[in-house]
Amino acid sequence: MRTIAIVGKPNVGKSSLFNRILMRRKSIVDDQPGVTRDRIYDVGNWLTRDFMLIDTGGIISSEDTYQDNINEQVLFAINEANTIIFLVSAKDGINNDDKKIAKMLKEKAKDKKVILVVNKVESEKYYFNEGELYSFGFGKFFKISAEHGIGMGDLLDELVKDMPIQNALDQQERFKFCIIGRPNVGKSSLTNTILGEQRMIVNAEAGSTRDSIDNDFSYHNKKYTIIDTAGVRRKGKIVEAVEKYAVLRTQKAIERSQLILLVLDGSEPFKEQDEVVGGLAYDANIPTIIVVNKWDNIVNKNSHTMEMVKKQIRSQFKYLSWAPIVFISALDNKRIHTIFETIELVREQAMRKVATSLLNDVVIKANAFQEPPPFKGGRISISYVVQVQSQIPTFVLKCNNPKFLHFSYARYIENEIRKAFGFDSVPITLYWQDKNKKLRGE
């Protein structure tokens, strides 16, 4: 699959163009320069041709602590790409930053196809002349408005004209999981270690990742997609519109995932923010693995330290009592294999199907062994249980009247199912239904 990278100075509309090509909002768009910091990847399609598209941060000369990292990310993207879109703005005109980028592309991308694109042509006045553009040495250029879609057909035709026809990536084969956590717990370091390259900006200052970013990779011949997300801050600290949108992006990333890696910083006490993020995982009701990062930073560890930390996690994250816990050091690439071993364990449990006869045998016996307490004028009685298709183990329990169910008895039945069929590392859902109501399809 061919790869196309979009490069340019800040605020020329790179993310708007990225979103326009994909026909959906993937990158954060804002008038504030420097909003895109990492390389963002997604698969585009035009005229039955598939291609990988990369959005990059803006290149400028600046004292911004992130700028050197952003420029390095752009160079990574240029090296990966077959074709480069060099984007300038008709609204702002050509300046020294554009000229420096043109010079860099001549040096770093001399064997690649570079397409010069002038964005924001919906403006009434153009602050450049065509001779200035031709002086860059990239030949003809395209005039577009990414925001309004003007000129996009011609640009896309040019992008794909030499590409072979091929099918889209079979994303259904890939297991998709996201990495969440408060800022600066090491989410991007973990992503980089897994991918084997520095695709995400890693900086000691909290909040260096704003976009959620999809990365396809293989591990031991199994296909995965990993989504790194912006760190979730306390509500009082979300002051920028961009930060608010990044939190929403984290929630959307969770919705698109089959599993969550909840990353904690093991080198310091767990914080209220950690519990807030853990609450997002609980609300999602999908498999979750708690990843204790920076384990090598803990001094004076002994044979009991790991168990003590596990006990603390179980105390603070009672609502994730079923979630497995692993200990890693992302920066040092230590114990990363335990994440994938645990992912496969959790996947197997999430997909496990129980024979209806065995399920009923266990639940009916449990119901008879421990008499349910009277509640709201009656006592719950289970007559039949069936497992239904879902992303996590889900069971419908036919009973005399669901209003008679006390929460403590529901927990007892859930625990009996977990013990009997080995569902100790995944969430499970029980639906209590009047036995006179039929399930869909019955």
Swiss-Prot record:
The keyword GTP-binding applies. Gene3D superfamilies: 3.30.300.20, P-loop containing nucleotide triphosphate hydrolases (3.40.50.300). GTP 1 binds at residues 8-15, 55-59, 119-122. PROSITE patterns: G_ENGA. GTP 2 binds at residues 181-188, 228-232, 293-296. Disulfide bonds: none annotated. Keywords: GTP-binding, Nucleotide-binding, Repeat, Ribosome biogenesis. CDD domains: EngA1, EngA2. One of its GO terms (biological process) is ribosome biogenesis. InterPro entries: G_ENGA, GTP-bd, GTPase_Der, KH_dom-like, KH_dom-like_a/b, P-loop_NTPase, Small_GTP-bd. Residues 2-167, 175-351 form the EngA-type G domain. Residues 352-436 form the KH-like domain. GO terms for molecular function: GTP binding; ribosome binding. GTPase that plays an essential role in the late steps of ribosome biogenesis. HAMAP family: GTPase_Der (MF_00195). Belongs to the TRAFAC class TrmE-Era-EngA-EngB-Septin-like GTPase superfamily. EngA (Der) GTPase family. Associates with the 50S ribosomal subunit. This is GTPase Der. It comes from Ureaplasma urealyticum serovar 10 (strain ATCC 33699 / Western).
